[in-house]
Amino acid sequence: MVPGSQRIPRRRWIIGVLLGVGVLVNYIDRINLSVAAPQLQKEFSLSPEELGLLFSAFFWSYSLLQVPGGLVLDRFGVKKVGRWGAFLWAVASALTAISSGFGGIFAARVLLGVAEAPAFPASQKATGYWFPTGERSRSTAIFDSAAKFSNVIGVPLVAFAIVNLGWRWGFGITAVLSLAFFIAYWLIYRDPSEDKRLTKTEYDYIRAGGATPEGIAKGGQGAMLGYLLRNRKVWGLTIGFSAYGYSFYLFLTWLPGYLVQTLHMNIMQSAGYATIPWMFASLSDLFIGGFLVDHLIAKGYDETKVRKSVLVAGMLLGLAVFGAVGTTDPVWAITWITIALTGLAAAAPVGSSIVSLIAPRGGTGTIGGIVNFTNNLMGIAAPVITGFVVGITHSFAGAFLIAGIVLLVGIFSYVVILGRIEPVPEPSGVDAALLSGAAGR
């Protein structure tokens, strides 16, 4: 019998916080461009369409490298990939700070996408290793809520630097933060089996609770990728999570611009107002998508019903963005956007945690790569489509309508396609033979 959690050491939660800090830093790396956008637009005479392309530049490489990054992650492990990825975040932000125009900024953002591609799958994989299933929503919510919280502290921090020192300093600050995290990660992170600070009691507790086994996929990662791409459960999760991603990335990239253009705020005003919905989103992510979900499952409620209920309810609340269309009152606009982001944030860690909950041995990074690849295609689509819609119509109404339609598609996928939330069976029969053949080559 596993001892009660109150008697178990808490090394795993130190790792959880470390992962959260990493996501916090790499999302500040991303949002600095949206805060600097008004100054960049003025200095380089950028059109809304060009600005949309700059917003999406990061996601071209980030998305395209999600699946390869997941394969590399499953092959070389969280520790090595996480270390060098964090170092390259700093390099990319520094290059952005010294760029002299559209081309240089675009190239630096593409490099940032390359550097950060393995980051989220690495957090998902590490969480699977370090936490039993009964703590998976809370542990996932730590790093997932950090993505939202980055807007709470990152937007004002970067805005202050940009307004007082110039836009280049906004990127310089994020370069320093990335370098500091690289050092911390190098010193602290190890997988459970090699962490000398992890006690046997806690290790046994993690393993007995259903943590994802360490190790590589049978037959190699390429064969596992083909097997998982034929699985309905993987596609149900992928489509649903990507639908959430469209709205998330719309707000992540365009919220400051919406506040400046539609509500006629300056940079500091927009930064202040933008922190409000992201603050509520951070709390919703952590306490509803994390603690509440784990609590209900621990009380004996059906795991699939609990997780799907939060997914559907959260994405339905995301439709509240329509309320912002018909108002020019800043208070009402932010209220509607806050409701939408709060709902979406509650669904986010639930969807993200499903990656490790359905993964077969050695497949967490690969499923994470698949899910994050399609999710981040939305990171390309949302800012570009929004930029073109706003450029043509001079309004965000059409952009918000498109986001709502995408959310409805995601709800359908979660309800109908995903099925029960349980591990994908390890390959058998023909699939096992294919994997064995791949291993022998």
Which residue ranges define each predicted feature?
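Extracytoplasmic gate region of multi-pass secondary transporters
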Residues: 33-34, 229-287, 348, 352, ...
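Structural signature of the two symmetry-related core transmembrane helices
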Residues: 80-94, 305-322
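A late C-terminal transmembrane helix in Major Facilitator Superfamily
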Residues: 356-393
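Conserved MFS/SLC helix-loop-helix module at the cytosolic interface between two early adjacent transmembrane helices
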Residues: 64-103
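Central cavity-lining transmembrane alpha-helices of secondary-active solute carriers
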Residues: 56-71, 275-289
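Helix-breaking motifs and short loop linkers at transmembrane-helix boundaries and internal kinks
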Residues: 45, 77, 98-104, 115, ...
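Cytoplasmic helix-loop-helix junction between adjacent transmembrane helices
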Residues: 108-149
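Helix-loop-helix hairpin linking two adjacent transmembrane segments in secondary transporters
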Residues: 143-196
